[in-house]
A protein has these predicted regions:
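N-terminal, positively charged regions that mediate nucleic acid binding
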Residues: 2-72
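A generic local secondary-structure boundary/capping motif
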Residues: 19-20, 32-35, 43-44, 61-63, ...
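Catalytic cores of large soluble enzymes that bind and process phosphate-bearing ligands
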Residues: 20-21, 28, 66, 93-104, ...
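Short glycine/serine/threonine-rich phosphate/pyrophosphate-binding segments
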Residues: 39, 138-144, 161
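Glycine-rich, flexible beta-strand/loop modules in the N-terminal catalytic cores of phosphate-handling
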Residues: 40-124, 130-132, 137, 196, ...
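Small-residue-enriched alpha-helical segments and adjacent helix-cap loops
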Residues: 87, 91-93, 103, 107, ...
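Mobile "lid/hinge" segments at catalytic clefts and subdomain interfaces of large enzymes
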Residues: 155-236
Length: 236
């Protein structure tokens, strides 16, 4: 009988396993690479607080024939097990993606799609799977940053990276990536995605917020996004 090999540490098991750490809006942000999904073009496990999102990107080896558009597919998957819950249906199975998952996929798609070459016709699939959920650390933002990171690291042609943050307005103060309690009382729900030089996507809802406050919120978001992009560039 073959004796199983014992490893002294996790890093000895995976030669390419690397961990990168930084802070995002005052909370720890960690990237683990080289351990999962080795057949994808690039893969990373994103940890933001207690939130964990697995991000992967895959490109077909050949362009799709007979199409005049770029076949990009962005999927955000949020299963109930991530929150420690069991589906309430009779079969106890996960259903089709909910409205939140579909909207999150679109929020990630919008800033990333224009940065691919216009003539590109290869199928590209970006998948973000929520493994665990911390209500105070947005899985949408972790997924967006992770999608940007894996695409930038991969051999897929792309003019990124991008970064993204959420902005709230609590008691007149601008808050980056507000917690669950802060989101409940916030007068602003703003999501900003940007490159190092330009804002590429804004999604917002507000309770009569004036233009100056909105502009300040966007500028504050871009300052934080630049830090994220610098972090991604160090990994790339």
């Amino acid at each position: 009988m073959r004796t199983p090999r014992l490893f002294g540490s996790r890093k000895e098991t995976f030669d390419n396993f690397k961990v990168y750490e930084t802070m995002l809006a005052g909370r720890p942000f960690k990237v683990e690479m080289g351990k999962m999904c080795g057949l994808s073009n690039a893969s990373a496990l994103i940890r933001y607080g207690e939130t964990c999102v697995m991000c992967n990107v895959v490109m077909s080896p050949k362009p799709r024939e007979g199409v005049d558009f770029f076949p990009l597919n962005v999927e955000y998957e949020e299963k109930l097990y991530a929150a420690g819950r069991i589906p309430g249906s009779f079969m106890r199975r996960e259903g089709r993606p909910g409205e939140r998952a579909i909207l999150t996929s679109r929020v990630v798609d919008r800033p990333m799609r224009p940065l691919f070459p216009k003539e590109m016709r290869n199928d590209v699939c970006i998948t973000m799977t929520v493994m665990s959920l911390d209500p105070d650390c947005s899985p949408e933002i972790a997924g967006m940053i992770g999608a940007s990171l894996v695409t930038a690291v991969s051999d897929i042609p792309w003019n990124g990276p991008i970064g993204g943050v959420q902005v709230g307005l609590v008691d007149g103060e601008i808050v980056l990536n507000p917690t669950q309690e802060q989101r409940k009382v916030s007068d602003l729900a703003l999501t900003v995605a940007a490159t190092m030089d330009k804002i590429v996507m804004i999604e917002a809802g507000a309770n009569e917020v004036d233009e100056d406050t909105m502009l300040t919120a966007i500028k504050t978001a871009h300052v934080e996004i630049k830090k994220i992009i610098e972090f991604i560039n160090k990994i790339v």
